[in-house]
Amino acid sequence: MPRKASSTSDSRLKWRKWKRNPTASPSPSNRSSAAAAAADHSDDSDSAAVNEDDDSAVPEDADDETLAGAEDPVLDLREAEVLPSAEPVSAFPVATRRVVNRPHPSVLAVIAAERSACAGEGSAAVAAAPVLENISYGQQQVLSGVLPDHASLATDTDKPSTYVCTPPNLMEGHGVTKQFQGRLHVVPKHSDWFSPGIVHRLERQVVPQFFSGKSPGNTPEKYMLLRNKVIAKYLENPSKRLAFAECQGLVANTAELYDLSRIVRFLDTWGIINYLASGSVHRGLRMATSLLREEPTGELQLLTAPLKSIDGLILFDRPKCNLQAEDISSLASNSEVVDFDAGLAELDGKIRERLSESSCSYCLQPLTSLHYQSLKEADIALCSDCFHDARYITGHSSLDFQRIDGDNDRSENDGDSWTDQETLLLLEGIEKYNDNWNNIAEHVGTKSKAQCIYHFIRLPVEDGLLENIEVPDASVPFRAETNGYPHLDCNGSTSGNLPQKIPPDNQLPFINSSNPVMSLVGFLASAMGPRVAASCASAALSVLTVDDDSRVNSEGICSDSRGQGPHPNFRDHNGGVSSSISPEKVKHAAMCGLSAAATKAKLFADQEEREIQRLTATVINHQLKRLELKLKQFAEVETLLLKECEQVERIRQRIASDRVRIVSTRLASPGNSLPGGSTSTMSSNPMSMSPRPMGVPGSMPQSSMPAPFANNMQGHGHPQMAFLQQQQRQQMLSFGPRLPLSAIQTQPSPQTSNIMFNPGMPNSVTPNHHQLLRSSSGNNSSVG
């Protein structure tokens, strides 16, 4: 292919020539060659397109014309998406700002994910969005991950380190308390990401050689061991500043001192150690004075050698804590707890209650009900203003936060807690509005429609609900006297002592209504049915209409207190008092009616249960009958199949016997015998012998044996004939090819006859005293 051998310079020359003359109409040959060149040199064209900014001979108007008149759709898409202008933003990591004509699909995915996060739709759309690294606030020079082949893992420590870190936002305050090996550990607010049991991403950036997997001696477990040793050393005396010289005894060999120094300086930088230490020196001024040196000429020279380590790259002040180590020790000493573990938990709770507060992780303002919770760190939350202004915490972006609306959560949680008064209002609303849940929710007043429906479904359909609901006391106090009236319990039995059976006032339904008995009957008629309500009304009426001596005596006793109760006296048409019903009697009647209704409902329930059992048994019997009918039908079909099989077997045996008889008749015919002179010819020329037919078994010629042999074979039950019948039966069952009777010939070889009938004779001797032992010619036409 001559086009494959073209050089890169030729392809670039063609590209530039075509780009300078985009409007010229090329000839068909040139157009086809240009298309072929573009197809063959796609890589060269891409490299030329990348380096098109270096071509100073092409004017800007030519580029515009190229965008308008280019015929290659791939080039049009590439040039239309990204403009050639580029502005460098950062040298490390390399970041370039480019102008685009239309957003990339990844940008659209990020915008959709941010909108869903702001709307509180969950993290389903966030999972599909690309991973972003925020370089706007505090992360312009922070690497989120270090690859195993990164330059920072080089063994040469004299080279400048590629680790660059931006100072965190200092958050002055009381700090955050954490548990570390049974002791309290106070860290700054901006170091709340630290956890003794895990390794944070910022820690992996400081000592990446422990997490690259290149060295078997440097493992994450070893890093955690060194880090925890340093922190434990500091917690022995938090008021004293821990220096690197004091930590050198924590490692066994000098090769680990460099890693230990980086760990100590990192922990000191973030305030994980020396946060409560007093007398700390302003590290920024100390480093500034140590890096500047005045030359004899009077010029100031900046020393770059110390900047090779992390110590020179992080230049910011130490975080200061408003608390002192004595405050923590005083709190620990004042706690009067016997159990050590329980004391630590209680002390931790006290310190957290005093030091920590629910505030924004960036501006430290108290969080409102609407805020944004981090998906990476559980203790990081932002207020609405900081989130919308993109003031994120180090290592976070907008996709790492989830919208939290406290009002919605509170309303959902409140839907699970119902007071007795709200439950009563719900039952009253159901009784009043039937199934109109909007009116029921308005009647309750404090719950929504869905919460009312959910709570009503969860209510137990038992009398235990009424026992747990507290109803305000009635205006008339309850009396234990029953005036001798019989009391019916839930089972309908009569009890002699009413005070042991009558429940208190707060356990009777509709006790505060003007007529408790009628209210109960009406409720049962609408909820349970007219028959249950009729039994309740009948029992209550029987109690109210009992006329005995005790009632007459009670009328005289209650005459002084007429009109005081909630139930007025009944008067006749003449204006006289006809009867007076005491509140206790009304309660007794309501309870008896309720017991009768419960008994009636129980009877109906038992009747329905028996009906269900009867119907279930009927269904099962019908299914069993269907199964029996199917089994009977299958048995009949099986019987018919067996009969057909027997008939087919008899027909097969008859056909086999007929076939054997016909074959025997053909073989015993005198025309099959040949002169003896042909025997030598057949024996001398074995190739002239016709092959044995496939359908005739090897023992077929034995059917025409002489009488002495035949008699001998008959005396032993004809084994050869049985074998012949078995072979014929197998041939009929095997669906193999069938040969006509005319094709069956007797062509026994001399060796076969000698072996069967004269095994003692040599193979060269062929007796001709019997017709079966004489060989026949292959061209005998008398057979068939």
Curated annotation (Swiss-Prot):
Residues 1-68, 667-702, 760-784 are annotated as: Disordered. The keyword Zinc applies. Gene3D superfamilies: Homeodomain-like (1.10.10.60), Winged helix-like DNA-binding domain superfamily/Winged helix DNA-binding domain (1.10.10.10). The keyword Transcription regulation applies. Keywords: Chromatin regulator, DNA-binding, Metal-binding, Nucleus, Stress response, Transcription, Transcription regulation, Zinc, Zinc-finger. Its main location: nucleus. Residues 185-284 form the SWIRM domain. It is found in: Nucleus; Nucleus, Nucleoplasm. Residues 43-66 have a biased composition (Acidic residues). GO terms for biological process: chromatin organization; regulation of response to water deprivation. A zinc finger (ZZ-type) spans 355-409. Coiled coil: none annotated. This is SWI/SNF complex subunit SWI3C homolog. It comes from Oryza sativa subsp. japonica (Rice).
